[in-house]
Curated annotation (Swiss-Prot):
The gene is spm1. Disulfide bonds: none annotated. It is an enzyme of class 2 (transferase). GO terms for biological process: cell integrity MAPK cascade; negative regulation of glucose mediated signaling pathway; negative regulation of mitotic cytokinesis; positive regulation of calcium ion import across plasma membrane; positive regulation of calcium-mediated signaling; regulation of fungal-type cell wall biogenesis. Residues 23-314 form the Protein kinase domain. PROSITE patterns: MAPK, PROTEIN_KINASE_ATP, PROTEIN_KINASE_DOM, PROTEIN_KINASE_ST. ATP binds at L29, G30, Q31, G32, A33, Y34, G35, I36, V37, K52. Mitogen-activated protein kinase, part of the mkh1-mkk1-spm1 MAPK cascade that regulates vegetative growth, conidial formation, colony surface hydrophobicity, osmotic stress, cell wall integrity maintenance, carbon and nitrogen source utilization, chitin distribution, septa formation, and pathogenicity. CDD domains: STKc_MPK1. This is Mitogen-activated protein kinase spm1. It catalyses: L-seryl-[protein] + ATP = O-phospho-L-seryl-[protein] + ADP + H(+); L-threonyl-[protein] + ATP = O-phospho-L-threonyl-[protein] + ADP + H(+). Keywords: Activator, ATP-binding, Conidiation, Kinase, Magnesium, Nucleotide-binding, Serine/threonine-protein kinase, Sporulation, Transferase, Virulence. Belongs to the protein kinase superfamily. Ser/Thr protein kinase family. MAP kinase subfamily.
């Protein structure tokens, strides 16, 4: 086919999958609301890649914006060892296209698959995983970016326990000005089980602490082998958090922006905080101290990423000289674009420009460009976790709660529903 010169067509999950002719598709990895993913091998270098076909890019304006955001952020964070590396991009049929291909690092599975495999994990595993998440998050936050959807399914892991953060489709910018942060939310919200309480309760603004809460939920899941706050809906999610962390103090209660939610919490019986040592009796006391600081109900009391990296629990890994900041902040100016036609043009320009850049660099260096390798040795992965990839928790459109009434609807949309 003339319009596919230099490319080959494979069937992946019964869909046409158009890849660069240098690659051969080797395995179907996963499919979901935003696309399908397969493993492929570069026939020239024998290196593996994951190829993600982002589908229906322009079926909704919010999906086009999500695709543009992901493409831009993956380029901006390219090269950090704890963030998935973008190798290449392609739009095989640029005329009126509705799909984009992303060539990324091939990882063996995600952290959700490892946890759900039931294989025993050690405290050394927990330390390694949390340290790497925080290193990646420090880099992300230093660019004034909030990830907003950290969860085990968005943490990719290799057999040597090398971990990389992926999926930036829900990311937003952060400003020290609360008024600017207040305008950055969308209809799609982070997965309920890992969502910070200040989002549900409509606090005045969001801070980097929302991502720290998610890391705390992940640490608790590692310690317990299952999601820590697994709410059936948003009211149940809030109840589960309060059941463990106890009734907030008056200062925190007064910051709840939703009158209905504030009244609901005030009318609940007083609940004492449950000690994490009773919930995780076999855990390292340092891990429980870090967990307690990450899962502080009030975001202003929550530990920062920088402080967490210096916590005694991570002392074995911590090396300030090997925990870099991003050299430049990320520009979110494109978020103001609302015209789908303009977004289509911007995505085309991003893809074509990046293709030129990586081909120039590859030509100079003689091969595929990868991210940095970990600076410290890793602990081995339990055998049962390998070979599974991108298991999914509830997707944003599955728990939106747009049609929910009363308190459930307010908690589902959080501050977004009040702006």
């Amino acid at each position: 086919m003339a319009d596919l010169q230099g490319r080959k067509v494979f069937k992946v999950f019964n869909q046409d999958f158009i890849v660069d002719e240098r690659y051969t598709v080797t395995k179907e990895l996963g499919q979901g609301a935003y696309g399908i993913v397969c493993a492929a091998v570069n026939n020239q270098t024998n290196e593996g890649v994951a190829i993600k076909k982002v589908t229906n890019v322009f079926s909704k304006k919010i999906l086009a914006k999500r695709a543009l955001r992901e493409i831009k952020l993956l380029q901006h964070f390219r090269g950090h060892r704890n963030i998935t590396c973008l190798y290449d991009m392609d739009i095989p049929r640029p005329d009126n296209f509705n799909e984009t291909y992303l060539y990324e690092e091939l990882m063996e599975c995600d952290l959700a698959a490892i946890i759900r495999s039931g294989q025993p994990l050690t405290d050394a595993h927990f330390q390694s995983f949390i340290y790497q998440i925080l290193c990646g998050l420090k880099y992300i936050h230093s660019a004034n970016v909030l990830h907003r959807d950290l969860k085990p399914g968005n943490l990719l892991v290799n057999a040597d326990c090398e971990l990389k953060i992926c999926d930036f489709g829900l990311a937003r910018g952060f400003s020290i000005d609360p008024e600017e942060n207040a305008g950055y939310m969308t209809e799609y919200v982070a997965t309920r089980w890992y969502r910070a309480p200040e989002i549900m309760l409509s606090f005045q603004s969001y801070t980097k602490a929302i991502d720290v809460w998610s890391v705390g939920c992940i640490l608790a899941e590692l310690l317990g082998g299952r999601p820590f706050f697994k709410g059936r809906d948003y009211v149940d999610q809030l109840n589960q958090i309060l059941h463990i962390l106890g009734t907030p103090n008056e200062e925190t209660l007064s910051r709840i922006g939703s009158p209905r939610a504030q009244e609901y919490v005030r009318n609940l019986p007083f609940m004492p905080k449950k000690p994490f040592a009773a919930l995780f009796p076999n855990a390292n006391p340092d891990a429980l101290d870090l967990l307690d600081r990450m899962l502080a109900f009030d975001p202003s009391s929550r530990i920062s990423v920088e402080e967490a990296l210096e916590h005694p629990y991570l002392q074995i890994w911590h090396d300030a000289s090997d925990e870099p900041d991003c050299p430049t902040t990320f520009n979110f100016d494109f978020e103001i674009v609302e015209d789908v036609g303009d977004m289509r043009k911007m995505i085309l320009e991003e893809v074509f420009r990046f293709r030129q850049v990586v081909r120039t660099v590859a030509g100079e260096n003689g091969g595929q460009q990868a991210g940095q390798q970990p600076g410290a040795g890793q602990v081995p992965m339990p055998s049962g976790g390998q070979g599974q990839w991108r298991t999914e928790d509830p997707r944003p459109e599955e728990y939106m709660g747009h049609n929910a009434n009363g308190l459930e609807g307010e908690l589902a949309l959080g501050a977004d529903g009040r702006r």
